[in-house]
Each structure stands twice: as structure tokens, then as C-alpha cells.
């Protein structure tokens, strides 16, 4: 039982690491590309073509993507990178490091993070673009008239107004990240063992529910892990939503206080005959 609890905590840690490691570069890259593609000052040749190409990985099945990267970067001697590495006289490189104690988590996790980022940044980019295009163009025109540079327009106009879309992306990505299963489960050369660095909570649930020996099936552990995963998702979702709402409320209160202060100042000047 203690082993099961340890495995669940390790799986939860792996899930968080894999999600954070692919969400941060994904959102940054998506924001950068969305700003570029929606900037009227930039004339990028073949803009529509690049949008389609960047979105394409999102429609490829996870099985196909995992098979592709196993052929490119894996422990298999037939993989492209290991083949080149061994042709230079080196021993086969352990990209997967399937056991925790081997200490090579960085490679396997890094590859899965890259795959997840590559698969999903196109979808996130489209959502960021839709959010930017939904902003009133007159705000950008006013900022340009006031002499704001590109960085100031981004930080003072685009990002604040894009925050609802970023929060929505964060919540949906967090839900998907906590349910991450396909790529971590499929990316391993040894078909008889799961990479311990990549065992997520969803894989933990599957392993305890689906075993070769039906006598050792642990439906209770699978059910409990599923409920815990659901509760964690709900709590984190509510936390992010409340944080965003509280930030909006704090901003509105600050604006109201400023208006009240200005009103009182004007009233005081009026009483003193200071209004011209």
C-alpha cells in the first residue's frame, strides 16, 4: 500500500513537471507569434501558409507523433539521432532513462515537453490571435498617436486586454495537463515497461485498472486516484478563476477610489472658488 501511495505522489509530481515544462514555452511562443501575425505594421510573406503549418501538429494523432519521435530521438539504435551518434564511434545514448534511479529524467521529460509544446502551440496561437483581433483597433491607434512604442503597446494595451483569453488558456491547458496520458505513455522503446519519469496520474490510473493478471486489478486505487485528480483540477481551476476575478476587483476598486478622490478635490476647489 505504501508503494502505491509513493507511486501516486511520484506520478502527480511528474504530471505537474511535464505540464509546467510545456505550458510556459507554449504560451510565450504563442503570444509572440500571435502578436507578429496580427501586427498591421509587419508584412510577413506567406502569413496564411505559416499559420496553417503551425496548426498542423494539433490535428496529427498522438500515436503518429509518438512513433515519429521514437524514430527520431529514442533508445532504439534505428533512431535517427542515435544512429548518427553511434556512427561517430560513441555508445548508444540513453535518451529515455526509464528508471528513476538512473538520473536521466531531463532527457525523457524534455523530449515529451517539446512534443507537447510542438503539438499544442498552434492551437494556443490561434486563440491568442482571436483575442487580439477582438480588441478595439481604436485603442491601438490611440496608443500610436500618443507615441507609444511596440513594447509599450504590448504591455499596456494588448496583454491587459488579453488576460481573459490567457486565463481561459491556462485553465484549459491545466485540465488537459493533469489528464496527460497519450504521449508520456507511448514514448518508450521498451514495450513491457512504462518510463517512470513519464508516469502521470492518468497512466497510474490506467496501470491499476488495466493489468494482464485480472487477479491483481486495483479498481479501488484507480477510482480513488481519478477522484483525487478531479478534485485537484476543480480546486486549481477555482483558484485561478478567483485570482483573476480578485485582480479585476482590486483594479476596479483602485479606479473608483481615484475617481472619488478626484471628485472630492473638485468639490473642495469649487467651495474655495478655485474653478476657473
Map each language-model feature to its residues.
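A structural signal for multi-pass alpha-helical bundles of membrane permease subunits
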Residues: 1-270, 275-276
Amino acid at each position: 500500500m505504501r508503494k502505491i501511495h509513493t507511486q501516486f505522489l511520484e506520478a502527480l509530481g511528474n504530471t505537474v513537471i511535464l505540464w509546467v515544462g510545456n505550458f510556459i514555452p507554449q504560451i510565450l511562443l504563442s503570444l509572440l507569434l500571435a502578436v507578429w501575425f496580427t501586427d498591421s505594421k509587419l508584412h510577413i510573406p506567406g502569413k496564411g501558409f505559416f499559420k496553417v503549418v503551425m496548426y498542423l501538429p494539433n490535428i496529427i494523432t498522438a500515436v503518429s507523433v509518438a512513433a515519429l519521435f521514437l524514430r527520431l530521438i529514442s533508445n532504439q539504435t534505428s533512431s535517427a539521432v542515435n544512429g548518427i551518434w553511434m556512427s561517430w564511434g560513441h555508445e548508444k545514448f540513453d535518451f529515455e532513462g526509464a528508471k528513476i534511479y538512473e538520473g536521466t529524467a531531463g532527457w525523457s521529460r524534455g523530449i515529451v515537453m517539446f512534443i507537447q509544446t510542438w503539438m499544442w502551440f498552434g492551437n494556443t496561437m490561434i486563440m491568442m490571435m482571436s483575442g487580439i483581433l477582438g480588441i478595439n483597433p481604436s485603442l491601438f491607434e490611440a496608443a500610436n498617436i500618443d507615441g507609444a512604442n511596440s513594447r509599450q503597446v504590448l504591455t499596456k494595451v494588448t496583454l491587459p486586454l488579453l488576460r481573459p483569453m490567457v486565463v481561459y488558456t491556462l485553465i484549459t491547458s491545466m485540465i488537459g495537463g493533469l489528464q496527460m496520458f497519450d504521449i508520456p505513455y507511448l514514448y518508450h522503446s521498451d514495450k513491457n515497461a512504462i518510463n517512470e519519469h513519464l508516469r502521470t496520474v492518468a497512466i497510474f490510473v490506467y496501470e491499476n485498472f488495466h493489468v494482464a493478471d485480472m487477479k491483481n486489478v486495483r479498481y479501488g486505487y484507480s477510482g480513488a486516484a481519478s477522484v483525487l485528480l478531479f478534485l485537484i483540477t476543480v480546486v486549481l481551476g477555482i483558484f485561478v478563476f478567483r485570482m483573476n476575478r480578485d485582480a479585476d476587483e482590486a483594479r476596479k476598486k483602485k479606479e473608483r477610489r481615484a475617481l472619488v478622490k478626484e471628485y472630492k478635490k473638485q468639490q473642495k476647489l469649487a467651495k474655495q472658488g478655485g474653478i476657473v
